[in-house]
Design a protein with these regions (language model features):
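Non-catalytic, surface beta->alpha helical segment in thiol-disulfide oxidoreductase systems
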Residues: 58-85
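Thiol/disulfide oxidoreductase modules built on the thioredoxin-like
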Residues: 46-52
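Local sequence-structure signature of Cys/Sec-based thiol-disulfide redox active-site neighborhoods
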Residues: 1-28
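Thiol-based oxidoreductase modules, predominantly thioredoxin-like and allied folds used
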Residues: 28-41
Length: 86
């Protein structure tokens, strides 16, 4: 399964939703909490071009946030990305 990385904050409801969808699908992910860590938040913003959380990557592909993750799931594209081998 492709590596999934998600930048989060502890109190973000969109982060909770995104993580719940991934967990429901049995996907292990690397969570990078950016609460109060300016360096990690700056890293996320530089990588994503966005400052909002969550920011999600599947492999090297930036998915975006929670809305984009759920949209990908509704279109039937999430499982294919998750099962891709690099």
């Amino acid at each position: 399964m492709t590596q999934v990385t998600i930048y989060t904050t502890r109190w973000c409801p969109f982060c909770v939703r995104a993580k719940a969808l991934l967990a429901h699908k049995g996907v292990a992910f690397d969570e990078i909490p950016v609460d109060g860590d300016r360096a990690l938040r700056a890293e996320m913003a530089a990588r994503a071009g966005r400052t909002s959380v969550p920011q999600i990557w599947i492999g090297e592909q930036h998915i975006g946030g929670c809305d984009e993750l759920f949209s990908l799931e509704r279109r039937g594209g999430l499982d294919a990305l998750l099962s891709d081998r690099p």
